[in-house]
């Protein structure tokens, strides 16, 4: 009897992640829908990517985004048959750790992560697009 009980308990414990996965996925979908330009997850991703860019491309080891202000959405392209990715175009003013203010433009793309789960964030800080990836003055993201 104790072996049967332990086997059942172990089976239930191993199946628990499988049962909770849809619930977690539901939470992720709700979270993803709630993401807007000022969502903390989006801003954290931008800040992290900017630190890497500042260190690796501009050789500014301590430069970071210190604060965001005037966050706004200026365009939203919803997902359609002819446009499979929903995109939210945003802008903001940032204060860098050296005290300088800059304009930042960014896009949040929905459903472009692994297996179409997750979002992608691309950004351009005015004056920091050394290779003109987003054209002069971050034009592509404006």
What are the roles of these predicted feature ranges?
Residues 1-9:
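Bacterial N-terminal signal peptides that target proteins for export
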Residues 14-22:
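C-terminal segment of classical bacterial N-terminal signal peptides
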Residues 19, 31, 140-142:
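Terminal targeting/leader modules
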Residues 24-86:
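N-terminal secretory signal peptides
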Residues 73-106:
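Mid-chain, structured segments of secreted extracytoplasmic proteins
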Residues 100-121:
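Extracytosolic low-complexity repeat regions of secreted or lipid-anchored proteins
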Residues 114-142:
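C-terminal partner/receptor-binding element of secreted or periplasmic proteins
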């Amino acid at each position: 009897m104790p072996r049967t009980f332990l086997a059942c308990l172990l089976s239930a414990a191993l199946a628990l992640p499988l049962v909770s996965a849809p619930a977690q996925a539901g939470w992720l979908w709700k979270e993803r829908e709630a993401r807007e330009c000022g969502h903390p997850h989006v801003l954290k991703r931008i800040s992290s990517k900017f630190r890497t860019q500042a260190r690796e491309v501009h050789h500014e080891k301590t430069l970071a985004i210190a604060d965001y202000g005037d966050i706004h959405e200026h365009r939203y392209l919803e997902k359609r048959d002819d446009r499979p990715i929903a995109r939210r175009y945003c802008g903001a003013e940032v204060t860098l750790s050296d005290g300088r203010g800059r304009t930042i433009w960014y896009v949040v793309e929905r459903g472009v992560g692994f297996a179409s789960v997750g979002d992608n964030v691309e950004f351009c800080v005015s004056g920091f697009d050394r290779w003109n990836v987003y054209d002069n003055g971050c034009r592509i993201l404006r």
